[in-house]
Curated annotation (Swiss-Prot):
Keywords: Calcium, Cell membrane, Cytoplasm, Golgi apparatus, Lipoprotein, Membrane, Metal-binding, Myristate, Repeat, Synapse. Monomer. Interacts with KCND2. Interacts in a calcium-independent manner with PI4KB, but only if myristoylated. This binding competes with CALN2/CABP7 binding to PI4KB. Interacts in a calcium-dependent manner with PICK1 (via AH domain). Interacts with ARF1, ARF3, ARF5 and ARF6. Interacts with IL1RAPL1. Interacts with RIC8A; interaction is favored in the absence of Ca(2+) and myristoylation of NCS1 is not required. Neuronal calcium sensor, regulator of G protein-coupled receptor phosphorylation in a calcium dependent manner. Directly regulates GRK1 (RHOK), but not GRK2 to GRK5. Can substitute for calmodulin. Stimulates PI4KB kinase activity. Involved in long-term synaptic plasticity through its interaction with PICK1. May also play a role in neuron differentiation through inhibition of the activity of N-type voltage-gated calcium channel. Residues 174-190 are annotated as: Interaction with IL1RAPL1. The gene is NCS1. It is found in: Golgi apparatus; Postsynaptic density; Cytoplasm, Perinuclear region; Cytoplasm. Gene3D superfamilies: EF-hand (1.10.238.10). This is Neuronal calcium sensor 1. Its main location: Golgi. Pfam families: EF-hand_1, EF-hand_7. Ca(2+) 2 binds at D109, D111, D113, Y115, E120. One of its GO terms (cellular component) is perinuclear region of cytoplasm.
Length: 190
């Protein structure tokens, strides 16, 4: 993408409009903001973490932001270009429940082997607990990452093999209204 250009080429806007749930005008607006914050046209992990720190000032979002960064960074070059950013934003903010669940499963499947292991889920849940800090009062049965993961696996790991397939993850998540609600949090806000 162009260095500090305030406008995208029409063919790029058209392509991103086709690939996302955003209008041409919205793509242009997001690009303008992206270039303002990232004049190089790219966002690195440290910059991404800084953004998360603004939203979670009472916890430590570093670990979670790194996990999210890795999902946004589709081509795995250590930087998020605008096209990667807008496509991930589209799914997380306006995608269908199944699209959001596929995206979330990429977040949890840290080694990209198609399964979410207990340890992978523990890494993510621990990162979430660090990020929110003491700002959220958790029920006794979920007040540690380990307890939360035990509860999730008891509910979702139907064949008790210690790992979740995409199907188990999707079905289990849909059966838990609190998870569906969390995934729908940003609907209509962007």
């Amino acid at each position: 993408m162009g260095k500090s250009n305030s406008k995208l080429k029409p063919e790029v806007v058209e392509e991103l409009t086709r690939k996302t749930y955003f209008t041409e005008k919205e793509v242009q607006q997001w690009y303008k903001g992206f270039i303002k914050d990232c004049p190089s046209g790219q966002l690195d992990a440290a910059g991404f973490q800084k953004i998360y720190k603004q939203f979670f000032p009472f916890g430590d979002p570093t670990k979670f932001a790194t996990f999210v960064f890795n999902v946004f960074d589709e081509n795995k070059d250590g930087r998020i270009e605008f096209s990667e950013f807008i496509q991930a934003l589209s799914v997380t903010s306006r995608g269908t429940l199944d699209e959001k669940l596929r995206w979330a499963s990429k977040l949890y499947d840290l080694d990209n082997d198609g399964y979410i292991t207990r340890n992978e889920m523990l890494d993510i849940v621990d990162a979430i607990y660090q990020m929110v800090g003491n700002t959220v009062e958790l029920p006794e049965e979920e007040n540690t990452p380990e307890k939360r993961v035990d509860r999730i696996f008891a509910m979702m790991d139907k064949n008790a093999d210690g790992k979740l397939t995409l199907q188990e993850f999707q079905e289990g998540t849909k059966a838990d209204p609190s998870i569906v609600q969390a995934l729908s949090l940003y609907d209509g806000l962007v």
